[in-house]
Protein backbone atom coordinates (compact mmCIF):
# COMPACT_ATOMS: atom_id res chain seq x y z
CA UNK A 1 0.00 0.00 0.00
CA UNK A 2 1.19 3.54 -0.78
CA UNK A 3 0.24 7.05 0.36
CA UNK A 4 -0.28 9.57 -2.42
CA UNK A 5 -1.24 13.26 -2.67
CA UNK A 6 -2.42 14.93 -5.88
CA UNK A 7 -2.48 18.70 -5.40
CA UNK A 8 -3.60 21.81 -7.25
CA UNK A 9 -2.60 24.83 -5.17
CA UNK A 10 -1.82 28.54 -5.27
CA UNK A 11 1.87 27.84 -5.88
CA UNK A 12 1.31 25.91 -9.12
CA UNK A 13 -2.00 27.21 -10.50
CA UNK A 14 -3.49 30.70 -10.86
CA UNK A 15 -6.94 31.41 -9.44
CA UNK A 16 -8.54 31.24 -12.90
CA UNK A 17 -7.56 27.55 -13.06
CA UNK A 18 -8.05 26.70 -9.37
CA UNK A 19 -11.66 27.81 -9.58
CA UNK A 20 -12.24 25.16 -12.26
CA UNK A 21 -11.14 22.44 -9.82
CA UNK A 22 -13.01 23.51 -6.68
CA UNK A 23 -15.40 21.09 -4.98
CA UNK A 24 -18.51 22.69 -3.53
CA UNK A 25 -19.11 21.74 0.12
CA UNK A 26 -22.42 20.05 -0.73
CA UNK A 27 -20.79 17.68 -3.23
CA UNK A 28 -17.71 16.69 -1.24
CA UNK A 29 -19.16 13.51 0.28
CA UNK A 30 -20.43 12.33 -3.11
CA UNK A 31 -17.03 13.07 -4.64
CA UNK A 32 -15.18 11.01 -2.01
CA UNK A 33 -17.64 8.14 -2.43
CA UNK A 34 -17.08 8.23 -6.20
CA UNK A 35 -13.30 8.35 -5.81
CA UNK A 36 -13.42 5.44 -3.36
CA UNK A 37 -14.84 3.28 -6.16
CA UNK A 38 -11.97 4.10 -8.53
CA UNK A 39 -9.46 1.38 -9.36
CA UNK A 40 -6.48 1.19 -6.97
CA UNK A 41 -7.94 3.64 -4.41
CA UNK A 42 -8.23 2.08 -0.93
CA UNK A 43 -8.79 5.22 1.17
CA UNK A 44 -9.24 8.91 0.34
CA UNK A 45 -9.81 12.38 1.77
CA UNK A 46 -10.52 15.40 -0.46
CA UNK A 47 -9.62 18.89 0.77
CA UNK A 48 -10.90 21.87 -1.24
CA UNK A 49 -10.28 25.47 -0.13
CA UNK A 50 -9.76 28.83 -1.83
CA UNK A 51 -6.04 28.12 -2.20
CA UNK A 52 -5.91 24.38 -2.87
CA UNK A 53 -7.76 21.30 -4.03
CA UNK A 54 -5.94 18.18 -2.84
CA UNK A 55 -6.67 14.48 -2.92
CA UNK A 56 -5.04 12.37 -0.22
CA UNK A 57 -5.20 8.67 -1.02
CA UNK A 58 -4.00 5.24 0.02
CA UNK A 59 -3.50 3.22 -3.16
CA UNK A 60 -2.39 -0.33 -3.86
CA UNK A 61 -0.16 0.72 -6.79
CA UNK A 62 1.45 4.14 -7.24
CA UNK A 63 1.33 4.30 -11.04
CA UNK A 64 -2.26 3.07 -11.28
CA UNK A 65 -3.35 5.27 -8.38
CA UNK A 66 -1.83 8.39 -9.94
CA UNK A 67 -3.58 7.76 -13.24
CA UNK A 68 -7.04 7.07 -11.84
CA UNK A 69 -6.96 10.04 -9.47
CA UNK A 70 -6.01 12.33 -12.36
CA UNK A 71 -8.78 10.77 -14.42
CA UNK A 72 -11.26 11.26 -11.58
CA UNK A 73 -10.39 14.97 -11.35
CA UNK A 74 -10.66 15.46 -15.09
CA UNK A 75 -13.97 13.56 -15.34
CA UNK A 76 -15.52 15.27 -12.32
CA UNK A 77 -14.80 18.77 -13.64
CA UNK A 78 -15.42 17.81 -17.29
CA UNK A 79 -11.88 18.54 -18.42
CA UNK A 80 -9.25 16.57 -20.32
CA UNK A 81 -6.41 14.98 -18.33
CA UNK A 82 -4.00 16.94 -20.54
CA UNK A 83 -5.60 20.21 -19.34
CA UNK A 84 -5.29 19.27 -15.68
CA UNK A 85 -1.88 17.55 -15.58
CA UNK A 86 0.40 20.64 -15.99
CA UNK A 87 -1.02 22.19 -12.82
CA UNK A 88 -0.78 19.10 -10.63
CA UNK A 89 1.87 18.47 -7.99
CA UNK A 90 2.19 14.86 -6.82
CA UNK A 91 3.67 13.75 -3.50
CA UNK A 92 4.37 10.10 -2.70
CA UNK A 93 5.11 8.11 0.46
CA UNK A 94 7.27 10.17 2.90
CA UNK A 95 6.74 13.28 0.78
CA UNK A 96 2.97 12.81 0.92
CA UNK A 97 2.98 12.35 4.70
CA UNK A 98 5.22 15.40 5.18
CA UNK A 99 2.98 17.47 2.88
CA UNK A 100 -0.15 16.63 4.89
CA UNK A 101 1.58 17.63 8.14
CA UNK A 102 2.87 20.89 6.61
CA UNK A 103 -0.48 21.83 5.12
CA UNK A 104 -2.39 21.14 8.34
CA UNK A 105 0.11 23.10 10.45
CA UNK A 106 -0.22 26.09 8.09
CA UNK A 107 3.35 25.86 6.78
CA UNK A 108 2.24 25.52 3.15
CA UNK A 109 -0.40 28.26 3.32
CA UNK A 110 -0.22 31.56 1.44
CA UNK A 111 -0.34 33.05 4.94
CA UNK A 112 2.30 30.95 6.75
CA UNK A 113 1.00 29.91 10.16
CA UNK A 114 -2.72 30.57 9.61
CA UNK A 115 -5.04 28.26 11.53
CA UNK A 116 -8.11 28.13 9.29
CA UNK A 117 -6.66 25.25 7.27
CA UNK A 118 -6.57 23.06 10.40
CA UNK A 119 -10.35 23.28 10.71
CA UNK A 120 -10.77 22.64 6.99
CA UNK A 121 -8.60 19.50 7.12
CA UNK A 122 -10.49 18.22 10.15
CA UNK A 123 -13.87 18.83 8.49
CA UNK A 124 -12.79 17.01 5.31
CA UNK A 125 -11.46 14.07 7.32
CA UNK A 126 -14.68 13.73 9.32
CA UNK A 127 -16.75 13.84 6.12
CA UNK A 128 -14.53 11.13 4.62
CA UNK A 129 -15.11 8.99 7.71
CA UNK A 130 -18.87 9.45 7.42
CA UNK A 131 -18.89 8.00 3.90
CA UNK A 132 -16.41 5.26 4.93
CA UNK A 133 -13.71 6.58 2.58
CA UNK A 134 -11.04 6.22 5.28
CA UNK A 135 -9.65 3.09 6.86
CA UNK A 136 -6.95 1.97 9.26
CA UNK A 137 -4.11 4.03 7.75
CA UNK A 138 -5.81 7.41 7.29
CA UNK A 139 -7.74 7.16 10.55
CA UNK A 140 -4.42 6.94 12.37
CA UNK A 141 -2.52 9.43 10.17
CA UNK A 142 -5.13 12.20 10.24
CA UNK A 143 -5.65 11.78 13.99
CA UNK A 144 -1.89 12.20 14.45
CA UNK A 145 -1.72 15.16 12.04
CA UNK A 146 -4.59 17.08 13.68
CA UNK A 147 -3.15 16.52 17.15
CA UNK A 148 0.30 17.76 16.08
CA UNK A 149 -1.11 20.85 14.34
CA UNK A 150 -2.89 21.86 17.55
CA UNK A 151 0.31 21.31 19.53
CA UNK A 152 2.38 23.27 17.00
CA UNK A 153 0.17 26.32 17.34
CA UNK A 154 0.08 26.12 21.14
CA UNK A 155 3.84 25.57 21.58
CA UNK A 156 5.06 28.17 19.05
CA UNK A 157 4.11 31.76 18.21
CA UNK A 158 3.68 31.14 14.48
CA UNK A 159 0.00 32.07 14.50
CA UNK A 160 0.37 35.28 16.49
CA UNK A 161 1.68 37.40 13.62
CA UNK A 162 -0.06 35.53 10.79
CA UNK A 163 -2.83 37.34 8.98
CA UNK A 164 -5.73 35.56 7.31
CA UNK A 165 -6.70 36.17 3.69
CA UNK A 166 -9.71 38.11 4.98
CA UNK A 167 -7.43 40.27 7.13
CA UNK A 168 -5.14 40.88 4.16
CA UNK A 169 -8.14 42.09 2.14
CA UNK A 170 -8.96 44.62 4.86
CA UNK A 171 -5.32 45.74 5.11
CA UNK A 172 -5.31 46.39 1.37
CA UNK A 173 -8.42 48.55 1.80
CA UNK A 174 -6.74 50.54 4.57
CA UNK A 175 -3.72 51.20 2.35
CA UNK A 176 -6.01 52.73 -0.27
CA UNK A 177 -8.52 54.60 1.92
CA UNK A 178 -6.57 55.17 5.13
CA UNK A 179 -9.27 55.53 7.78
CA UNK A 180 -12.28 53.28 7.21
CA UNK A 181 -14.65 55.11 9.58
CA UNK A 182 -16.48 56.98 6.82
CA UNK A 183 -16.30 54.24 4.19
CA UNK A 184 -19.42 52.36 3.14
CA UNK A 185 -18.45 48.68 3.24
CA UNK A 186 -20.35 45.90 1.48
CA UNK A 187 -19.77 42.25 2.43
CA UNK A 188 -21.10 39.58 0.05
CA UNK A 189 -21.42 36.18 1.72
CA UNK A 190 -22.17 35.30 5.35
CA UNK A 191 -19.77 32.36 5.63
CA UNK A 192 -16.54 32.06 7.63
CA UNK A 193 -14.45 34.17 5.22
CA UNK A 194 -17.07 36.92 5.12
CA UNK A 195 -17.36 37.04 8.89
CA UNK A 196 -13.59 37.15 9.35
CA UNK A 197 -13.45 40.09 6.93
CA UNK A 198 -16.25 41.87 8.79
CA UNK A 199 -14.58 41.22 12.14
CA UNK A 200 -11.35 42.79 10.86
CA UNK A 201 -13.20 45.71 9.28
CA UNK A 202 -15.00 46.43 12.53
CA UNK A 203 -11.71 46.28 14.41
CA UNK A 204 -10.29 48.81 11.93
CA UNK A 205 -13.07 51.32 12.61
CA UNK A 206 -15.58 50.52 9.85
CA UNK A 207 -19.13 51.21 11.04
CA UNK A 208 -21.12 51.72 7.83
CA UNK A 209 -21.41 48.04 6.95
CA UNK A 210 -23.92 46.11 4.85
CA UNK A 211 -23.98 42.30 4.73
CA UNK A 212 -25.67 40.53 1.82
CA UNK A 213 -26.36 36.82 1.46
CA UNK A 214 -28.68 34.54 -0.50
CA UNK A 215 -30.25 33.55 2.84
CA UNK A 216 -31.23 36.85 4.44
CA UNK A 217 -31.48 35.40 7.96
CA UNK A 218 -27.77 34.47 7.91
CA UNK A 219 -26.86 38.00 6.81
CA UNK A 220 -29.01 39.43 9.62
CA UNK A 221 -27.30 37.33 12.30
CA UNK A 222 -23.84 38.34 11.09
CA UNK A 223 -24.68 42.03 10.63
CA UNK A 224 -26.20 42.28 14.10
CA UNK A 225 -22.92 41.16 15.73
CA UNK A 226 -21.09 44.15 14.23
CA UNK A 227 -23.82 46.80 14.22
CA UNK A 228 -24.31 46.53 10.47
CA UNK A 229 -27.29 46.21 8.15
CA UNK A 230 -28.44 43.12 6.27
CA UNK A 231 -29.93 43.01 2.80
CA UNK A 232 -30.99 40.36 0.33
CA UNK A 233 -28.86 39.76 -2.77
CA UNK A 234 -31.83 40.92 -4.83
CA UNK A 235 -30.88 44.46 -3.74
CA UNK A 236 -27.27 44.08 -4.90
CA UNK A 237 -27.32 46.75 -7.62
CA UNK A 238 -28.57 49.42 -5.19
CA UNK A 239 -25.98 48.38 -2.60
CA UNK A 240 -23.20 48.73 -5.18
CA UNK A 241 -24.22 52.35 -5.74
CA UNK A 242 -23.50 53.21 -2.09
CA UNK A 243 -20.38 51.10 -1.43
CA UNK A 244 -16.78 52.32 -1.28
CA UNK A 245 -15.32 48.91 -0.41
CA UNK A 246 -16.65 45.51 -1.46
CA UNK A 247 -15.34 42.20 -0.12
CA UNK A 248 -16.92 39.13 -1.68
CA UNK A 249 -16.80 35.47 -0.62
CA UNK A 250 -20.11 33.81 -1.47
CA UNK A 251 -18.79 30.56 -2.92
CA UNK A 252 -21.29 30.77 -5.79
CA UNK A 253 -20.62 28.67 -8.87
CA UNK A 254 -21.20 31.63 -11.24
CA UNK A 255 -20.31 35.33 -11.16
CA UNK A 256 -22.43 37.26 -8.67
CA UNK A 257 -21.30 40.57 -10.16
CA UNK A 258 -20.95 40.70 -13.94
CA UNK A 259 -19.27 43.31 -16.12
CA UNK A 260 -22.65 44.21 -17.60
CA UNK A 261 -24.08 44.88 -14.12
CA UNK A 262 -21.06 46.93 -13.05
CA UNK A 263 -21.08 48.98 -16.25
CA UNK A 264 -24.62 50.14 -15.42
CA UNK A 265 -23.67 50.82 -11.79
CA UNK A 266 -20.61 52.90 -12.74
CA UNK A 267 -22.74 55.24 -14.83
CA UNK A 268 -24.80 56.02 -11.72
CA UNK A 269 -21.85 56.41 -9.31
CA UNK A 270 -20.79 59.80 -10.69
CA UNK A 271 -17.14 58.81 -11.04
CA UNK A 272 -16.75 57.53 -7.45
CA UNK A 273 -14.21 54.67 -7.41
CA UNK A 274 -15.14 51.26 -6.00
CA UNK A 275 -12.48 49.09 -4.36
CA UNK A 276 -13.38 45.40 -4.80
CA UNK A 277 -11.67 42.35 -3.29
CA UNK A 278 -12.81 38.92 -4.45
CA UNK A 279 -11.57 36.27 -2.00
CA UNK A 280 -13.90 33.56 -3.29
CA UNK A 281 -12.81 30.52 -5.30
CA UNK A 282 -14.54 30.11 -7.73
CA UNK A 283 -14.53 33.90 -8.13
CA UNK A 284 -17.67 35.93 -7.43
CA UNK A 285 -16.72 38.93 -9.56
CA UNK A 286 -16.15 38.90 -13.32
CA UNK A 287 -12.42 39.70 -13.79
CA UNK A 288 -13.31 41.76 -16.89
CA UNK A 289 -14.67 44.41 -14.46
CA UNK A 290 -11.07 45.46 -13.82
CA UNK A 291 -11.14 47.01 -17.31
CA UNK A 292 -13.72 49.57 -16.16
CA UNK A 293 -12.39 53.00 -15.24
CA UNK A 294 -13.97 53.35 -11.81
CA UNK A 295 -13.62 49.78 -10.53
CA UNK A 296 -10.45 48.50 -8.89
CA UNK A 297 -10.61 44.72 -8.60
CA UNK A 298 -8.27 42.43 -6.66
CA UNK A 299 -8.54 38.65 -6.40
CA UNK A 300 -7.07 36.25 -3.86
CA UNK A 301 -3.76 35.91 -5.75
CA UNK A 302 -3.28 39.71 -5.64
CA UNK A 303 -3.12 39.54 -1.84
CA UNK A 304 0.22 37.68 -1.89
CA UNK A 305 2.24 40.86 -1.38
CA UNK A 306 0.11 41.98 1.57
CA UNK A 307 0.49 38.70 3.47
CA UNK A 308 4.30 38.86 3.30
CA UNK A 309 4.26 41.04 6.44
CA UNK A 310 6.12 39.40 9.37
CA UNK A 311 7.00 36.47 7.12
CA UNK A 312 10.62 36.23 8.32
CA UNK A 313 9.49 35.95 11.94
CA UNK A 314 6.96 33.26 11.07
CA UNK A 315 9.50 31.27 9.06
CA UNK A 316 11.69 30.96 12.18
CA UNK A 317 8.76 29.41 14.02
CA UNK A 318 8.07 27.23 10.97
CA UNK A 319 11.52 25.65 11.37
CA UNK A 320 10.58 24.55 14.90
CA UNK A 321 7.35 23.04 13.63
CA UNK A 322 9.14 21.24 10.79
CA UNK A 323 11.36 19.56 13.38
CA UNK A 324 8.22 18.47 15.28
CA UNK A 325 6.78 17.14 12.01
CA UNK A 326 9.89 15.07 11.27
CA UNK A 327 9.69 13.47 14.73
CA UNK A 328 6.02 12.70 14.21
CA UNK A 329 6.64 11.14 10.78
CA UNK A 330 9.13 8.72 12.38
CA UNK A 331 6.46 7.71 14.91
CA UNK A 332 3.86 7.22 12.18
CA UNK A 333 6.20 5.16 10.00
CA UNK A 334 7.03 2.98 13.00
CA UNK A 335 3.32 2.43 13.58
CA UNK A 336 2.83 1.76 9.86
CA UNK A 337 5.59 -0.84 9.84
CA UNK A 338 3.87 -2.77 12.64
CA UNK A 339 0.68 -3.15 10.57
CA UNK A 340 2.28 -6.15 8.89
CA UNK A 341 2.49 -7.96 12.21
CA UNK A 342 -1.20 -7.46 13.08
CA UNK A 343 -2.37 -10.56 11.14
CA UNK A 344 0.36 -12.63 12.83
CA UNK A 345 -0.67 -11.45 16.30
CA UNK A 346 -4.35 -12.07 15.51
CA UNK A 347 -3.57 -15.61 14.35
CA UNK A 348 -1.53 -16.23 17.52
CA UNK A 349 -4.37 -14.98 19.74
CA UNK A 350 -6.94 -17.05 17.81
CA UNK A 351 -4.84 -20.19 18.24
CA UNK A 352 -4.43 -19.57 21.97
CA UNK A 353 -8.16 -18.89 22.42
CA UNK A 354 -9.02 -22.04 20.46
CA UNK A 355 -6.84 -24.05 22.87
CA UNK A 356 -8.56 -22.35 25.83
CA UNK A 357 -12.00 -23.12 24.37
CA UNK A 358 -11.10 -26.79 23.80
CA UNK A 359 -9.77 -26.99 27.36
CA UNK A 360 -13.03 -25.58 28.75
CA UNK A 361 -15.08 -28.16 26.80
CA UNK A 362 -12.84 -30.97 28.11
CA UNK A 363 -13.07 -29.63 31.67
CA UNK A 364 -16.88 -29.42 31.56
CA UNK A 365 -17.01 -33.04 30.36
CA UNK A 366 -14.80 -34.20 33.20
CA UNK A 367 -16.55 -32.05 35.84
CA UNK A 368 -20.17 -31.92 34.65
CA UNK A 369 -21.57 -30.41 37.85
CA UNK A 370 -19.85 -27.01 37.49
CA UNK A 371 -22.23 -24.08 38.00
CA UNK A 372 -22.46 -21.27 35.41
CA UNK A 373 -20.64 -18.96 37.82
CA UNK A 374 -17.80 -21.47 38.26
CA UNK A 375 -17.50 -21.88 34.49
CA UNK A 376 -17.25 -18.09 34.06
CA UNK A 377 -14.57 -17.81 36.76
CA UNK A 378 -12.49 -20.63 35.26
CA UNK A 379 -12.87 -19.20 31.74
CA UNK A 380 -11.85 -15.73 32.90
CA UNK A 381 -8.74 -17.00 34.70
CA UNK A 382 -7.60 -19.27 31.87
CA UNK A 383 -7.91 -16.33 29.44
CA UNK A 384 -5.91 -14.20 31.87
CA UNK A 385 -3.14 -16.83 31.87
CA UNK A 386 -3.13 -16.80 28.05
CA UNK A 387 -2.87 -12.99 27.94
CA UNK A 388 0.06 -13.01 30.36
CA UNK A 389 1.86 -15.72 28.39
CA UNK A 390 1.33 -13.91 25.07
CA UNK A 391 2.24 -10.42 26.28
CA UNK A 392 6.02 -10.70 25.83
CA UNK A 393 5.95 -12.59 22.49
CA UNK A 394 3.55 -9.96 21.07
CA UNK A 395 5.80 -7.09 22.20
CA UNK A 396 8.80 -8.84 20.62
CA UNK A 397 6.87 -9.37 17.37
CA UNK A 398 6.02 -5.65 17.21
CA UNK A 399 9.67 -4.72 17.77
CA UNK A 400 10.79 -7.16 15.08
CA UNK A 401 8.29 -5.64 12.61
CA UNK A 402 10.08 -2.27 12.83
CA UNK A 403 13.53 -3.81 12.18
CA UNK A 404 15.36 -4.55 8.93
CA UNK A 405 14.78 -8.06 7.61
CA UNK A 406 11.48 -8.20 9.48
CA UNK A 407 9.77 -10.60 7.06
CA UNK A 408 12.31 -13.42 7.62
CA UNK A 409 12.24 -12.95 11.40
CA UNK A 410 8.43 -12.90 11.50
CA UNK A 411 8.33 -16.05 9.36
CA UNK A 412 10.50 -17.75 11.99
CA UNK A 413 8.19 -16.37 14.70
CA UNK A 414 5.19 -17.94 12.92
CA UNK A 415 7.05 -21.26 12.60
CA UNK A 416 7.90 -21.34 16.33
CA UNK A 417 4.22 -20.99 17.22
CA UNK A 418 3.14 -23.29 14.35
CA UNK A 419 0.85 -20.66 12.81
CA UNK A 420 -0.73 -21.67 9.51
CA UNK A 421 0.29 -19.45 6.56
CA UNK A 422 -3.26 -19.44 5.16
CA UNK A 423 -4.67 -18.25 8.48
CA UNK A 424 -2.18 -15.36 8.68
CA UNK A 425 -2.92 -14.34 5.07
CA UNK A 426 -6.65 -14.42 5.78
CA UNK A 427 -6.13 -12.12 8.74
CA UNK A 428 -4.01 -9.82 6.58
CA UNK A 429 -6.92 -9.43 4.15
CA UNK A 430 -9.22 -8.46 7.02
CA UNK A 431 -6.78 -5.75 8.17
CA UNK A 432 -6.30 -4.41 4.64
CA UNK A 433 -10.03 -4.01 4.03
CA UNK A 434 -10.98 -2.79 7.49
CA UNK A 435 -13.08 0.38 7.26
CA UNK A 436 -14.92 0.62 10.55
CA UNK A 437 -12.52 1.87 13.22
CA UNK A 438 -13.25 5.50 14.15
CA UNK A 439 -10.78 7.31 16.39
CA UNK A 440 -11.71 10.12 18.71
CA UNK A 441 -10.52 13.32 17.02
CA UNK A 442 -9.49 16.18 19.32
CA UNK A 443 -11.77 19.20 19.08
CA UNK A 444 -10.27 22.38 17.69
Swiss-Prot record:
InterPro entries for the chain: 4pyrrol_synth_GluRdtase, 4pyrrol_synth_GluRdtase_dimer, 4pyrrol_synth_GluRdtase_N, GluRdtase_CS, GluRdtase_dimer_dom_sf, GluRdtase_N_sf, NAD(P)-bd_dom_sf, Shikm_DH/Glu-tRNA_Rdtase
PROSITE patterns: GLUTR (PS00747)
Gene responsible for this protein: hemA
Subunit structure: Homodimer.
Name of the featured protein: Glutamyl-tRNA reductase
Protein's organism: Bacillus cereus (strain B4264)
Example GO BP: protoporphyrinogen IX biosynthetic process
Domain notes: Possesses an unusual extended V-shaped dimeric structure with each monomer consisting of three distinct domains arranged along a curved 'spinal' alpha-helix. The N-terminal catalytic domain specifically recognizes the glutamate moiety of the substrate. The second domain is the NADPH-binding domain, and the third C-terminal domain is responsible for dimerization.
SUPFAM superfamilies: Glutamyl tRNA-reductase catalytic, N-terminal domain, Glutamyl tRNA-reductase dimerization domain, NAD(P)-binding Rossmann-fold domains
Positions with a binding annotation for substrate: 49-52, 109, 114-116, 120
Gene3D superfamilies: Glutamyl-tRNA reductase, N-terminal domain, NAD(P)-binding Rossmann-like Domain
Catalytic center residues: 50
Protein function: Catalyzes the NADPH-dependent reduction of glutamyl-tRNA(Glu) to glutamate 1-semialdehyde (GSA).
Binding site for NADP(+): 189-194
Amino acid sequence: MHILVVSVNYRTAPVEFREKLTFQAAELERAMTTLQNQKSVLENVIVSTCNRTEIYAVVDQLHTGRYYIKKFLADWFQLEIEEVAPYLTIFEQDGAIDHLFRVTCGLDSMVVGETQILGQIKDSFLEAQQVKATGTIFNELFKQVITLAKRAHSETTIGESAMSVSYAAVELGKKIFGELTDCHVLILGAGKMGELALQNLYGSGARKVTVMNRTLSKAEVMAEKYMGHAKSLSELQCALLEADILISSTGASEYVITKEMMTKVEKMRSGRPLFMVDIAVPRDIDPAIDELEGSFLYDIDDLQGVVEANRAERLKEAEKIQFMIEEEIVLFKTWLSTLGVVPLISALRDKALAIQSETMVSLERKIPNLSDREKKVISKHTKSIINQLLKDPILVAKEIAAEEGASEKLALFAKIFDLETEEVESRAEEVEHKRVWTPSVPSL
